[in-house]
Amino acid sequence: MLKHPFLDVPYEPKLRYFLGPFDTYDREETLGEAFSHYNINLDIDREQLIKKYIIDNGSDLTYRHRKVLCDHLESALSDETYDFSQLFSQAPGYYCTLPEGWSDMENPRGFFEDIYRLTNEWWKDDLQKASLENQSTW
């Protein structure tokens, strides 16, 4: 069973993990200020944010964790009824403050489609490596 990268518990991927790098809680004056220069509704800004804060920041994930997380995202994207906007609201027990205005994002599904496209592009070798393994042995 695949274990969490930092804890001795089973790893259960959650789409909110993709939002973790954008958590501005207690960092409003630094990270929050940096995010204020981007418009989350513009494709070019979204792509820059995803590359810098998810792709480049994903180094704490092993190739196996990346595969499981991307598979989970693919599953959600294949469900036409999945409400991606709910991921941007404060969930009980999930303490993440997203940048101002993100809860009003025009196309939350599009944001996650961009994440899927870019992670599959930039993590291609890791995802391929993991797909060649027997996941039941993890």
PLM region spans:
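Amphipathic alpha-helical binding modules
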Residues: 85-138
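Charged, low-complexity surface segments at secondary-structure and domain boundaries
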Residues: 1-3, 51-59, 95-102
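Surface-exposed, interaction-prone regions used to assemble/regulate multi-protein complexes
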Residues: 12, 25, 29-32, 61, ...
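Alpha-helix boundary/N-cap detector
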Residues: 6, 10, 41-45, 64, ...
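Generic surface-pattern signal
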Residues: 20-27, 55, 59, 75-78, ...
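Amphipathic alpha-helical interaction modules
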Residues: 28-81, 85
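Short terminal alpha-helical segments
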Residues: 1-51, 116-120
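Generic detector of well-ordered alpha-helical segments enriched in charged/polar residues
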Residues: 16-19, 47-51, 55, 70, ...
